[in-house]
Swiss-Prot record:
GO cellular component: helical viral capsid; host cell cytoplasm; ribonucleoprotein complex; viral nucleocapsid
BP GO terms, sorted: symbiont-mediated suppression of host cytoplasmic pattern recognition receptor signaling pathway via inhibition of MAVS activity; symbiont-mediated suppression of host cytoplasmic pattern recognition receptor signaling pathway via inhibition of MDA-5 activity; symbiont-mediated suppression of host NF-kappaB cascade; symbiont-mediated suppression of host PKR/eIFalpha signaling; symbiont-mediated suppression of host type I interferon-mediated signaling pathway
GO molecular function, one term: RNA binding
Phylogenetic lineage: Viruses, Riboviria, Orthornavirae, Negarnaviricota, Haploviricotina
Protein purpose: Encapsidates the viral RNA genome by forming a left-handed helical nucleocapsid that protects the RNA from nucleases. RNA replication depends on the availability of soluble nucleoprotein. The encapsidated genomic RNA is termed the NC and serves as template for transcription and replication. Together with the phosphoprotein, sequesters host NF-kappa-B in inclusion bodies (IBs) thereby inhibiting this host defense pathway. May also act as a modulator of the innate immune response by sequestration of host IFIH1/MDA5 and MAVS into IBs.
Pfam families: Pneumo_ncap
UniProt gene name: N
Keyword RNA-binding carried by entry: yes
Region (Interaction with the phosphoprotein): 244-290, 338-364
Entry similarity comment: Belongs to the paramyxoviruses nucleocapsid family.
Protein name, per record: Nucleoprotein
PTM characteristics: Tyrosine phosphorylation modulates viral transcription and replication.
Residues recorded as bearing Phosphotyrosine in the entry: 38
Length: 391
């Protein structure tokens, strides 16, 4: 069986069927959910900052606070619209700042907290109590704490959301198998921020985002739209620039993403790139056009469900370590396979094709109808020799 004989028309037929539906499904977000407005954005940013300055911080609620901060940047009205457009029945809780009295070592103290149903006043108070301990330690060590080391630095919330952007890149796997890659990438891109904040612990923050998204899947819709809005806004801080790069890389619109990752060097970070094993097949274009029609979210919502995207994706070959077959055939690199493939014929064909590419060192780019700019980007990215590119 050769890959060129594999027919992948089922996706188009199913898409036509789904498009004819006259009905929509309404989902419930459960009880009241917190939807903060712009006016509490500064306070949510400070909550993120308190967690970041706290040495050995407990990041159990950091993912939730980060998502709430993203909502506050979108605003209450737009967040509600995003959820309703996604088919969610929403009962929204307004969020305000109030004074909370809490006993601390036998002494009553006052804290400014938010009226959140998802995070008690006591938990918010405890976050501030722990951060004050770390702040006092910083004062002793530094004498004076520079603005960029403080808990109220304006980029604290975006630092936390940079970790969220990395987590989003791994959601298609359906589990936390991408956590190691998230940690490694965060350690690299946020290295300057980690020097500023001892509480910036990528592993703990990433796990917190995984947990909040698993518990509240509607937050994915909110975060995707926030990421697009944030990345399309000109200007901003250095950390906002880092976030835009990370998010657009995940979303599929970064300049290193060509044809949804078919030829991208970092294919393992791309959702629909996993689907495109056929680097010399016309179906690659079909996958790409289908992805364009669905929008960037196709990577998040469809790779687990539609037959084409799951054909050679992580969901179809869960034990294929290092690279999935889509990467292997697209780049001519084979990883180690452990376990029994669901479709042995298809696996054997893909393996033979990938090994052929690897042996010959030739990738046929001509079938993708690439523009001059895209082809140049490939050359710059993969650094092929002239005789390694078949045009």
């Amino acid at each position: 069986m050769a890959l060129s004989k594999v027919k992948l028309n089922d996706t188009f037929n199913k898409d036509q069927l789904l498009s004819t539906s006259k009905y929509t499904i309404q989902r419930s977000t459960g009880d009241n959910i917190d939807i903060p407005n712009y006016d509490v954005q500064k306070h949510l940013n400070k909550l993120c900052g308190m967690l970041l300055i706290t040495e050995d911080a407990n990041h159990k609620f950091t993912g939730l606070i980060g998502i709430l901060y993203a909502m506050s940047r979108l605003g209450r009205e737009d967040t509600l619209k995003i959820l309703k457009d996604a088919g969610y029945q929403v009962r929204a809780n307004g969020v305000d700042v109030i004074t909370h009295r809490q006993d601390v070592n036998g002494k009553e103290m006052k804290f400014e907290v938010l009226t959140l149903v998802s995070l008690t006043s006591e938990v918010q108070g405890n976050i501030e109590i722990e951060s004050r301990k770390s702040y006092k330690k910083m004062l002793k060590e530094m004498g004076e704490v520079a603005p960029e080391y403080r808990h109220d630095s304006p980029d604290c919330g975006m630092i936390v959301l940079c970790v969220a952007a990395l987590v989003i890149t791994k959601l298609a796997a359906g589990d936390r198998s991408g956590l190691t890659a998230v940690i490694r990438r965060a350690n690299n891109v946020l290295r300057n921020e980690m020097k500023r904040y001892k509480g910036l612990i990528p592993k703990d923050i990433a796990n917190s985002f995984y947990e909040v998204i698993e518990k509240y899947p509607h937050y994915i819709d909110v975060f995707v739209h926030f990421g697009i809005a944030q990345s399309s806004t000109r200007g901003g801080s250095r950390v906002e620039g880092i976030f835009a790069g990370l998010f657009m890389n995940a979303y599929g619109a970064g300049q290193v993403m060509l044809r949804w990752g078919v030829l991208a060097k970092s294919v393992k970070n791309i959702m629909l790139g996993h689907a495109s094993v056929q680097a010399e097949m016309e179906q690659v274009v079909e996958v790409y056009e289908y992805a364009q029609k669905l929008g960037g979210e196709a990577g998040f919502y469809h790779i687990l469900n539609n037959p084409k995207a799951s054909l050679l994706s992580l969901t179809q070959f869960p034990n294929f370590s290092s690279v999935v077959l889509g990467n292997a055939a697209g780049l001519g690199i084979m990883g180690e396979y452990r376990g029994t493939p669901r479709n042995q014929d298809l696996y054997d064909a893909a393996k033979a094709y990938a090994e052929q590419l690897k042996e010959n060192g030739v990738i046929n780019y001509s079938v993708l109808d690439l523009t001059t700019e895209e082809l140049e980007a490939i050359k710059n990215q993969l650094n092929p020799k002239d005789n390694d590119v078949e045009l």
